[in-house]
UniProtKB/Swiss-Prot annotation:
Name the UniProt record assigns to this protein: Diaboline synthase
Main function: Acetyltransferase involved in the biosynthesis of curare monoterpene indole alkaloids (MIAs), natural products such as diaboline, a pharmacologically active compound used to regulate blood pressure. Curare alkaloids act as animal glycine receptor antagonists. Catalyzes the conversion of 17,18-epoxy-17-hydroxycur-19-ene (Wieland-Gumlich aldehyde) to diaboline.
First-listed, main subcellular location of the protein, grouped into a coarse class: cytoplasm
Quaternary structure (record): Monomer.
Length: 461
């Protein structure tokens, strides 16, 4: 049995004996209730040995915000034979406990910006009963879903406590289940989250499974001068709106033909979608402001396979960086040009750094390049920064706890302006883009005919 500490008695409430809060959420098309069943601390299945009691953050980890990075996995009961609520609860708690034995710092507590105290205090796990069928969530991903499958207000928030991981199991009336995780960016990037969730799921399917995460050594990523973690303009409070857009593979193929015919060298599907989104976002921003503003585009890239020698795919820690393109004149904001520049920037990064430099040199110089690019723009007029992250080709849809693959991997709306998240569609036949822009910019962006020629707006039904 895994180690479980309960600070709220786990007991399903009925209408005559409500021992737990009942949250009522009203929507124009439906009403639903969220009933908290339990809030639990899950500890590693065996104590962390003294030699591993302190996990030092790498210099790159230290530059990251202690912000909860969210992802949720939704499973329907149709044809999968999901066990009873009690069975699921014990299965997920015990498998999480066993998995944490191999991820001891996930169950520890952050100490300043220097290290994690691997004190086995545990991961917070909430269980909730959702009084509606999961179909209601699948029909309205823009509104209802977030508060049903995540702890309210937690995704993308700056952590107010030292807990590094918060998970939630949501039980729906139809028998469907959602499993979500909010993990501090101080200790993970997207690839790390993928590895952890797949290890947890594999442990649930087979209790004798042995995860083999490779914890990144803090000595790998040394910087001469570690920049302080600071709030950038994109993370300030703004009145923003989020929208989801669907790019079918057939439309991405059309984008590729346009780019290649104009001289771009075999851009990837992510680069193509990034280029058209960036073009249309800048066009909308220009219309809203009344004039063009110089801008920089940052696209995240996983460093594990780039550095020489490459790191294992199961390396845990922040091993992602960005490559950048910038535009100081409006005539550079043409789709084929942007697609070609993205491709060349990535190739330059791979060729210049991947083969010639070791890990620490790659990270330091790449960070220096980004800082120089930003400084070059900010020395003049104000500039806009557009940040893209891709979850495409990541094995999120392989996270199977024993009742099949998820019907949806759900990333909640992001509160930060000019952010874009790309993820494969559940049917693997396209890319879904989650876009967050300032409200006045979004009103123009979502009606851009140049965008809608290749993407469709995902609306709540």
């Amino acid at each position: 049995m895994g180690k479980i500490t309960k600070f709220v008695k786990s007991k399903v409430c009925n209408s005559t004996n409500r021992a737990f809060p009942l949250i009522v959420n009203h929507h124009t098309m439906a009403s639903f209730q969220i009933q908290i069943i339990s809030e639990t601390l899950i500890k590693p299945s065996s104590p962390t040995p003294p030699s591993l009691k302190q996990h030092q953050l790498s210099d790159y980890d230290k530059t990251m915000h202690h912000m909860y990075t969210p992802v949720a996995f939704l499973y329907t009961s149709h044809g999968h034979g999901i066990p009873s609520t009690d069975e699921v609860s014990q299965l997920l708690k015990n498998s999480l406990s066993k998995t944490l034995k191999h991820y001891s710092h996930f169950a520890g507590r952050l100490v300043g910006d220097s290290h994690v105290d691997c004190n086995d205090m545990g991961v917070k796990l909430l269980e909730v009963r959702v009084r509606c069928p999961m179909a209601e969530v699948l029909k309205r991903p823009n509104t209802d879903a977030q508060d049903l499958v995540y702890p309210k207000g937690l995704p993308w928030s700056m952590a107010k406590e030292d807990i590094l991981v918060v998970a939630q199991i949501s039980y729906f009336d139809c028998g469907g289940i959602a499993v979500s995780a909010d993990i501090s960016h101080k200790i993970v990037d997207v690839a790390s989250i993928t590895t952890f969730m797949n290890d947890w799921a594999a442990m649930a399917r087979n209790s004798s499974y042995k995860p083999s995460p490779q914890i990144v050594s803090p000595t790998i990523l040394k910087m001469d001068d570690v920049p302080a973690t600071a709030e950038d303009d994109n993370m300030k409070e703004n009145i923003c709106q989020s929208r989801r857009f669907l790019f079918h593979d057939s439309k991405i193929a059309e984008l590729k033909a346009l780019a290649v015919n104009s001289g771009a060298e075999n851009p990837t599907r992510v680069e193509l979608v990034t280029a058209i989104l960036h073009k249309c976002a800048v066009t909308a921003s220009t219309a809203a402001l009344g004039s063009f503003m110089p801008n920089i585009l940052l696209l995240a890239v996983n460093l594990r396979s780039i550095i020489s020698p490459p790191l294992a795919k199961t390396s845990i820690g922040n091993m992602s960086s960005c490559y950048a393109i910038s535009a100081t004149h409006e005539n550079r904001m043409k789709f084929p040009l942007l697609a070609g520049e993205l491709r060349r920037s990535k190739i330059k990064l791979f060729q210049k750094y991947g083969k010639q430099l070791n890990e620490s040199e790659l990270l330091f110089l790449n960070s220096t390049d980004k800082a120089h690019e930003s400084q070059k723009l900010s020395d003049g007029d104000n500039f806009d920064c557009f940040i893209f992250s891709s979850l495409c080709r990541s094995p999120f849809y392989e996270v199977d706890f024993g009742w099949g693959r998820p019907v949806l991997v759900y990333v909640p709306n992001c509160p930060f302006k000019n952010t874009f998240f790309l993820i494969d569609t559940p049917t693997q036949d396209g890319i879904e883009a989650l876009v967050t822009l300032e409200e006045n910019v979004m009103q123009i962006f979502e009606n851009d005919e140049g965008l809608l020629a290749f993407a469709s707006l995902i609306k709540d039904s």
